[in-house]
């Protein structure tokens, strides 16, 4: 089994929620924040020694206080860039090997991460998906005849479902993804 490292993208301002704190610190019904649920799920799926890296920006001190044992990557342009540039910074700062990365606002069950372990262990890049009906806001996907992702974006027509915002990038694919993210505009989503 490969040592697992997880990156949480938490630099954004979350302006659509209209709250005075980062979106990952939104409280859930069980009393935890979204980020605390993510951290708990990561520990449950991968163990307590998992390297967790969090990309911070907006009100970064609040995120640092919420996850003091994490490694932090600062996106100093958080108010001018979207997630592609935060992910780029994170991948450049990551340790060798595969990276599980997720958006800081994803609420999920630990089983999602446990299912991705096979991809991690076999060196496969993967995205977690939901095959329910999708709307314009979601990141949608299509697949080719071999079942591999063909298209992945908010503008996909005829999407089979949505990418839920939890992904694995294999070590062998990391350099290519870094190159593509470097080519993206500041306002692009991944």
Stretch-by-stretch model annotation:
Residues 63-139, 143:
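Conserved beta-loop-beta/alpha segment of the NTase-like Rossmann-fold superfamily
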